[in-house]
UniProtKB/Swiss-Prot annotation:
InterPro entries: GTP_cyclohydrolase_FolE2 (IPR022838), GTP_cyclohydrolase_FolE2/MptA (IPR003801). PANTHER family: GTP CYCLOHYDROLASE MPTA (PTHR36445:SF1). Keywords: Hydrolase. Belongs to the GTP cyclohydrolase IV family. Pathway: Cofactor biosynthesis; 7,8-dihydroneopterin triphosphate biosynthesis; 7,8-dihydroneopterin triphosphate from GTP: step 1/1. GO terms for molecular function: GTP cyclohydrolase I activity. This is GTP cyclohydrolase FolE2.
């Protein structure tokens, strides 16, 4: 018999007291795939986000209300941008009756690009992550982008009579924001400092351009992170960052890798 007596009040087990007196820094749901709308320069476009949502749980409370995380995503369907993301973060803390919490959402982001010679247009996809957290009343927002580029080895070019080994590389920038920073602007910082950027569609004249451009602009993995770091350092919208470059070496079965981390609040003159 599944009938429920209207007079019966179901117990709220999660809100009961816990006697172990151990707080939990982060508890919530992970890997929730949900439709999102992205606010872009081209307008509002549909996408799919993978969400991780969690809150702080006080020592005296037994559990959090897991269903409320998903209910939040269903209720708050505004197009995703930095302003609406901050609102989503505030709403989560209100809904979960929490003092601290964190939201992370990863989604594919498409940018229309024009080939350098033929002018054909195509889409390039980038993996983008927005992370927001509230701790001790302070809100912090991070924008992360994984940007695929081409790198060409300066040493290989120098020692060879002709040619040089080159490969696809991944530039990952996770920046803490002090102001509005479009995804496109962050992506361009990486692409403009690579040996050459990538396009989704190229014709033969474009392939010639890309090959020669990379050859004329060789960079070690160390060069990549240093040159991009100079761009991040100069941008006042960015207060801190973790910058990674990984070259998938075409002549080895391993990658070359470099990382630069900086918090401008701790190193204001660096």
């Amino acid at each position: 018999m599944n009938d429920i007596n209207p007079a019966f009040v179901m117990p709220d087990v999660q809100s009961s007291r816990d006697t172990r007196q151990i707080p939990i820094q982060r508890v919530g749901v992970k890997g929730v795939r949900y439709p999102v709308s992205l606010k872009t320069p081209a307008g509002v476009v549909p996408s799919v986000g993978t969400f991780n949502l969690d809150v702080h749980l006080p020592a005296e409370v037994k559990g959090t209300h897991m269903s409320r995380f998903v209910a939040l995503l269903e209720e708050e369907r505004a197009p995703l941008e930095l302003a609406s993301f901050r609102v989503l973060l505030d709403k989560m803390l209100e809904k979960l009756e929490a003092e601290a919490g964190r939201i992370e959402v990863t989604f594919p982001y498409f940018i229309s690009k024009i080939a350098p010679v033929s002018g054909v247009e195509s889409l390039m996809d980038y993996e983008v992550t927005l992370t927001g957290e509230i701790r001790n009343g302070v809100t912090r927002v991070f924008l992360k982008a994984l940007v695929p580029v081409t790198s060409l080895c300066p040493c290989s070019k120098k020692i060879s009579q002709y040619g040089a080994h080159n490969q696809r590389s991944h530039i990952t920038m996770n920046v803490e924001l002090a102001g509005e920073l479009p995804v496109e602007a962050l992506v361009r910082m990486a692409e403009e400092e690579a040996s050459c950027e990538l396009w989704g569609l190229l014709k033969r004249p474009d392939e010639k351009f890309v090959t020669e451009r990379a050859y004329e602009n060789p960079k070690f993995v160390e060069d990549l992170v240093r040159d991009i770091a100079m761009r991040l350092n100069a941008d006042e919208r960015i207060v801190a960052y973790v910058l990674e470059a990984e070259n998938f070496e075409s002549i080895h079965n391993h990658s070359a890798y470099a990382v630069i981390e900086r918090d401008k609040r701790l190193e204001p003159t660096a």
